[in-house]
A protein has these predicted regions:
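Class I (Rossmann-like) S-adenosyl-L-methionine-dependent methyltransferase catalytic domain
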Residues: 1-62, 78-160
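Local beta-strand N-terminus motif with an aromatic residue
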Residues: 65-66
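A conserved beta-strand element that flanks and buttresses the S-adenosyl-L-methionine
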Residues: 70
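Short catalytic micro-motifs in class I SAM-dependent methyltransferases
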Residues: 73-77
Length: 160
C-alpha cells in the first residue's frame, strides 16, 4: 500500500514502512530532516519519495493517493487554528477506505499552555474526525517510550 507521513522529520517511520514493503511519501517543510532522510534511505537502498513543502500545499496533486497516513507528531506541532484544515487535508489525501493511523499526543497538555507541541484532547480529535470517518482502533499503546506513557493514544480513523 501507499503511505504518507506528514511532518516526517528525520523519517524514521518512513524508513520502517519502506523496509516493510510500503510505497512511502514523506513530507516536511524543513530542509535538514528531509536531507537526513534522503541520505539514510540511499544508504539503505530504499526508495522513498520525499517532499520538502508545507503539508497544506499537497492538494490537489496528491488527492486520493494514499492508503495510509501516519500521524505521530505533526498534529501537535501545527497551529491549533489549522486543525480543521488538517482534518480536511488528510481526508482529501486518503483513498476511500484509507486509514489515518494516529498516535495522538500530548493528551496531558492544554492548548493554552502553548507549543509546539500544542496540547491535544481526545474528545477534540474525535469531534474533528466525527463526520466522514469511522474509528477502527482506540486504545493506549501497549508500548510507549517512558516519556510518553499515558500521554498518547492510538486512534485509527477510516475514511468513509
Amino acid at each position: 500500500g501507499k503511505v504518507c507521513i506528514l511532518g516526517c522529520g528525520n523519517g524514521y517511520d518512513a524508513i520502517l514502512f519502506s523496509k516493510k514493503g510500503f510505497s512511502v511519501t514523506a513530507v516536511d517543510f524543513a530542509e535538514t530532516p528531509i536531507h537526513n532522510l534522503e541520505t539514510n534511505a540511499k544508504s539503505l537502498s530504499l526508495s522513498i519519495e520525499t517532499i520538502k513543502k508545507d503539508i497544506f500545499d499537497l492538494t490537489p496533486n496528491y488527492s486520493s493517493q494514499f492508503d495510509y497516513i501516519i500521524e505521530q507528531t505533526c498534529f501537535c506541532a501545527i497551529d491549533p487554528l489549522k486543525r480543521k484544515q488538517y482534518s480536511n487535508l488528510v481526508h482529501d489525501l486518503l483513498k476511500v477506505g484509507g486509514k489515518l493511523i494516529g498516535l495522538w499526543m500530548p493528551l496531558d497538555k492544554d492548548i493554552i499552555d502553548g507549543g509546539p507541541p500544542f496540547g491535544v484532547k481526545e474528545n477534540e480529535i474525535k469531534k474533528l474526525f466525527s463526520t466522514k470517518w469511522k474509528i477502527t482502533e482506540d486504545c493506549f499503546p501497549i508500548q510507549s517510550i517512558e516519556a510518553r506513557k499515558g500521554r498518547e493514544k492510538l486512534i485509527i480513523f477510516e475514511k468513509l
